[in-house]
Amino acid sequence: MPTDIEIADAAKMQPITEIAQKLGLSSDDIEQYGHYKAKINLPVKEVEGKKHKLILVTGINPTSAGEGKSTVLVGLGDALNQLGHQTTIAMREPSMGPVFGIKGGATGGGYSQVVPMEDINLHFTGDMHALTSANNTLAALIDNYIMRDNVLGLDPRRIIWKRVEDVNDRVLRNVVTGLGGIMQGVPRETGFDITAASEMMAILCLSESLHNLKKRIGRIVVGYTYEKKPVTVDQLGFTGAITLLLKDAIKPNLVQTLDHTPAIIHGGPFANIAHGCNSVLATQIALKTSDYTVTECGFGADLGAEKFLDIKRPVLGETPNAVVIVATARALKLNGGADKDELTKEDIPALEKGMANLRRHVENMQKYNLPIVVAINHFNSDTEAEIKTIQDACAEMGVKAIEVDAWAKGGQGTQDLAKEVVKLADEELEFHELYKNSDSIEDKLSAIATKIYGAKRVVLSKKAKRQIKTFNEQGWNDLPVCIAKTQYSFTDDQTKLGAPTDFDFHIRDLVPKLGAGFIVALSGTMMTMPGLAKHPAAENMDIDDNGQIAGLF
């Protein structure tokens, strides 16, 4: 079997104008970035007669290598089109942090990929750079404001706006700026986040138009005065300049799968330290122009799916017609106590124990009253006994578990799943909310921790309690909450795998993201700037004298 990059390099792509035509878009509706990439001009008109079905692809708590959720997503989109259901996929764009870190490329794999793969995984159309520039320009303007007149009395000790980079770089988590004398600015402690975890990224992904983007940027709270009053970008007068830097980045990107299914890729927030969903605009365009839209959310359903349903769905104005939960035998064995170096070996006892993790995710999606199917992503090490164990356990839960081989067979290996998705999407179910925005911040945190994670209670640090008091006084208590949590466990401790219950869930810090429209709650030891592993994926990457890339998965 060739590598992902070898398969992608051999692909015969259609001109992007032909892909656009499948969505009813003319050459005037797109801005081409070469022959195979384009940005979609806004606004996009709705195509009459479309079914507008939305399929959400999520997963279980993964191994560090990921479980192929994007691969299944692409295979499902291709399979639906092969079966005659006009489909578009809507995905997040990769961050170079994970690309060069643990997971490598993030455009699917095998024969279920989005192309041009190397472009998408590296710089693509420049959205990540635009977001980084907008974020850091605002940071520079804030520091300059403090150094100059500082009319509002912005306290350097209480600035919460950080600089960002699109890399995993732990040494930048805590830094001191402004050293070197009076002309170098006001010295203060600060730090860097990764671009994918920034509020600027969340704002881009939740904005419904350029006008809405500008309003959201203006609402950003950058810090507090000496009197502890919040200061926004609007108050500083920087809203227009920052919006200007994102005038092209707000336009979703159009590419294609190996099977020429339209793929709209836009925005890339992580689901563990951000809200984990691609842009509202990308999903809206797919829904307006397609019978079926297949989209994804990051990591397991405890993170990405919860945030899609509680944060993105209200802005999008659409509820998923069906949910696909991607599971693998190897991740279930890991959650059942198997050694991480022995996951390719058959281990039915560990698999049976690990099924508690999948069961929790299924039950969580059932709490929202959504139709569910489990996709068992096939790996070569899987045995018939393992697949049967998963399917039998799912049957006891009342859900189908369908084996897919999107990696080796593309859409052809995903057609059984596609047929079940079409069937489920026709069911008429009433969506159940997990909480109401009018609930208190404490109650919203408790709803997620107890109903989704299985916790006994939420334990707030003294700092978090003070912050909630401040947020209540400011009238910010009606915002949804976005919990930053490890992707490996339902708890705030990444070593506690499976499906723990009756544990304390700790919140140490809260950050108001008024531009994005939610409050971030940091649990456990979660960092908003990741670090690199001992052997990052970058070690295996190379390019030869002819520009041929190797090692990009």
UniProtKB/Swiss-Prot annotation:
<keyword id="KW-0554">One-carbon metabolism</keyword>
<comment type="similarity">
    <text>Belongs to the formate--tetrahydrofolate ligase family.</text>
</comment>
<dbReference type="GO" id="GO:0005524">
    <property type="term" value="F:ATP binding"/>
</dbReference>
<keyword id="KW-0547">Nucleotide-binding</keyword>
<feature type="binding site">
    <location>
        <begin position="63"/>
        <end position="70"/>
    </location>
    <ligand>
        <name>ATP</name>
    </ligand>
</feature>
<keyword id="KW-0067">ATP-binding</keyword>
<comment type="pathway">
    <text>One-carbon metabolism; tetrahydrofolate interconversion.</text>
</comment>
<dbReference type="GO" id="GO:0035999">
    <property type="term" value="P:tetrahydrofolate interconversion"/>
</dbReference>
<dbReference type="InterPro" id="IPR000559">
    <property type="entry name" value="Formate_THF_ligase"/>
</dbReference>
<dbReference type="InterPro" id="IPR020628">
    <property type="entry name" value="Formate_THF_ligase_CS"/>
</dbReference>
<dbReference type="InterPro" id="IPR027417">
    <property type="entry name" value="P-loop_NTPase"/>
</dbReference>
<dbReference type="Pfam" id="PF01268">
    <property type="entry name" value="FTHFS"/>
</dbReference>
<dbReference type="GO" id="GO:0004329">
    <property type="term" value="F:formate-tetrahydrofolate ligase activity"/>
</dbReference>
<protein>
    <recommendedName>
        <fullName>Formate--tetrahydrofolate ligase 2</fullName>
        <ecNumber>6.3.4.3</ecNumber>
    </recommendedName>
</protein>
<keyword id="KW-0436">Ligase</keyword>
